[in-house]
Amino acid sequence: MGLISSNSTITAPKSKGIIDPNTGELIGSDDRFFCEVNAELSEKGFLVTSADALITWARTGSLMWMSFGLACCAIEMMQCSMPHYDNERFGYAPRASPRQSDVMVVAGTLTNKMAPALRKVYDQMPEPRYVISMGSCANGGGYYHYSYSVVRGCDRIVPVDIYVPGCPPTAEALLYGILLLQKKIRRTGSIER
């Protein structure tokens, strides 16, 4: 009687995971890292790690960014936060105050009058702090490279960690830059910059 037959179990079937359509195998089933983590969890029931590794892991998954949108690249930066790309799924959430942010995205043409404000905002950010230079104008002046009022790259004012090329760069390029920054943080692994 009902939807369950008398010889079936009440428990749900074991999940199959995501199958790669090209090979027909589970995605990540041959990844050494995941195999080691699964083996350790099945044997002990918990993981052992160092405090530095745990802090680095937490920092890469909780980057708070502050926009410094100066021109048309800021439109692509806004698009990156919309549901189609949703950069928050990578642990990359916006903040309005520089005192609460880890990453500053400089998007657009930096003029000589705006350079002191950029440096002031950068100095207000807590350590460790990172800068992503987005677009050819922020990277090297762009179309306005020879103008008397344009800084030829924001790296002359603040240290830049990741350069995202393009005019304007796509939202995918910015997401790739974010992932590269997370990889850089994991690779350096230190709390101090």
From Swiss-Prot:
NDH-1 shuttles electrons from NADH, via FMN and iron-sulfur (Fe-S) centers, to quinones in the respiratory chain. The immediate electron acceptor for the enzyme in this species is believed to be ubiquinone. Couples the redox reaction to proton translocation (for every two electrons transferred, four hydrogen ions are translocated across the cytoplasmic membrane), and thus conserves the redox energy in a proton gradient. Its cofactor is [4Fe-4S] cluster. Keywords: 4Fe-4S, Cell inner membrane, Cell membrane, Iron, Iron-sulfur, Membrane, Metal-binding, NAD, Quinone, Translocase, Transport, Ubiquinone. This is NADH-quinone oxidoreductase subunit B. [4Fe-4S] cluster binds at residues 72-73, 137, 167. It is a peripheral membrane protein. Its EC number is 7.1.1.-. GO terms for molecular function: 4 iron, 4 sulfur cluster binding; iron ion binding; NADH dehydrogenase (ubiquinone) activity; NADH:ubiquinone reductase (non-electrogenic) activity; quinone binding. PANTHER family: NADH DEHYDROGENASE, NADH DEHYDROGENASE [UBIQUINONE] IRON-SULFUR PROTEIN 7, MITOCHONDRIAL. Belongs to the complex I 20 kDa subunit family. It catalyses: a quinone + NADH + 5 H(+)(in) = a quinol + NAD(+) + 4 H(+)(out). One of its GO terms (cellular component) is plasma membrane. It is found in: Cell inner membrane. It comes from the Bacteria. InterPro entries: NADH_UbQ_OxRdtase-like_20kDa (IPR006137), NADH_UQ_OxRdtase_20Kd_su (IPR006138). NDH-1 is composed of 14 different subunits. Subunits NuoB, C, D, E, F, and G constitute the peripheral sector of the complex. GO terms for biological process: aerobic respiration; electron transport coupled proton transport. Binds 1 [4Fe-4S] cluster.
